[in-house]
Regions:
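Hydrophobic alpha-helical elements at and bordering transmembrane segments
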Residues: 82, 86, 90, 120-127, ...
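Short cytoplasmic-facing helical segments at TM-TM junctions of multi-pass membrane proteins
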Residues: 163-211, 232, 236
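Transmembrane alpha-helical segments of polytopic membrane transport and secretion proteins
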Residues: 1-36, 264-289
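Periplasmic/extracellular loop-to-transmembrane helix junction in inner-membrane transport proteins
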Residues: 22, 50-98
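Transmembrane-helix boundary motif in ABC transporter permease subunits
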Residues: 95-125
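Hydrophobic alpha-helical transmembrane segments of polytopic membrane proteins
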Residues: 233-270
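Generic hydrophobic transmembrane alpha-helix motif, especially the helices
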Residues: 126-162, 169-170
């Protein structure tokens, strides 16, 4: 009996001519963020133009963009350029951030290992932490002058306490079972610190560093407002004296970019460090002490 073959086109399977269903366009998080930024900037520009808001009060976005482009196009070697003032402020931020964070972390390590010392220092740390640092800035400038040293000292003061407090909390938050497990394996105090306490404290330390990064930018501008010869804070004061509000907003953008870059670098380092951390000692079958 001969088999009957289906005729071409008689099968129910779709051919290449069948139109494919189109998937709905979906925007990612970054696309939505960019779209929101465009809408906000467009609304800003349109609102200022429609309501005839004076430029010295709220400049249009186009004026801010022109001022920013003019500042970026200037020679980086000119002492009145945006690049020169930015380099001064970035130097102050980095020096103050690293010095203040390092001191806060070092003292946090020592204090967390000595409960009695922590109890003695706790009221003084609380009192100094609640002290408004902006009010102390003029005194620091009087002590250290208008140079970079006074700004670094102000930034150190602002970044010291977040790292100190979070590092102490992190070293105290270690699981006691991990300590007991390592001690049962005859681990030395240094090995306990390296394999249990320090890994447990890392998330707390990075949280303090992220807060300190934001405070570092604020501290640099406060110090330059109080007394400085160069820096973005000085540039803002000069532009405000000339009623150049668009130029001031362009400096605000540069400061925001500096803060974003610093926090992004910290976040990348945090992801890399925490990703390559050894597994929890309590969950390992063997611990190489």
């Amino acid at each position: 009996m001969a088999a009957t073959l289906p005729l071409p086109g008689s099968m129910s399977t779709p051919t290449s001519d069948t139109p494919k269903a189109r998937r709905p366009l979906r925007l990612g998080t970054k696309s939505w963020s960019l779209l929101l930024l465009v809408v906000l900037l467009g609304g800003w520009e349109l609102g200022v133009r429609l309501f005839h808001v004076p430029k010295f009060l709220i400049p249009p976005v186009s004026d801010i963009a022109v001022a920013l482009w003019r500042g970026l196009a200037a020679s980086p070697f000119a002492k009145d350029s945006l690049w020169y003032h930015s380099a001064i402020t970035v130097t102050e931020i980095l020096l103050g951030f690293f010095v203040g964070s390092a001191i806060g972390l070092a003292i946090g390590v020592v204090v967390s290992q000595m409960p009695r010392l922590e109890a003695i220092l706790e009221p003084y740390v609380s009192a100094l932490q609640s002290l408004p640092k902006v009010a102390v800035a003029p005194i620091i400038v009087v002590w250290l002058g208008f140079g970079i040293g006074s700004k670094v000292a102000i930034i150190c003061l602002l970044t010291f306490f977040p790292v100190l407090v979070t590092s102490i909390a992190g070293f105290k938050a270690v699981d006691p079972d991990r300590i007991d497990l390592l001690r049962s394996l005859s681990a030395t105090p240094w090995q306990i610190f390296r394999k249990a306490k320090f890994p447990s404290a890392l998330p707390y330390i990075f949280a303090g560093l992220n807060m300190a990064a934001a405070f570092a930018v604020v501290g640099a501008i406060v110090g330059e407002f109080v007394g400085a010869q160069a820096g973005l804070g000085v540039l803002i004061q000069q532009m405000e004296a000339q009623m150049d509000t668009g130029g001031s907003f362009s400096v605000f953008i540069v400061l925001s970019v500096i803060g974003i870059v610093l926090t992004t670098m910290l976040r990348r380092i945090q992801q890399r460090v925490l990703h390559w951390m050894p597994q929890d000692p309590a969950q390992q079958r063997t611990i190489n002490v």
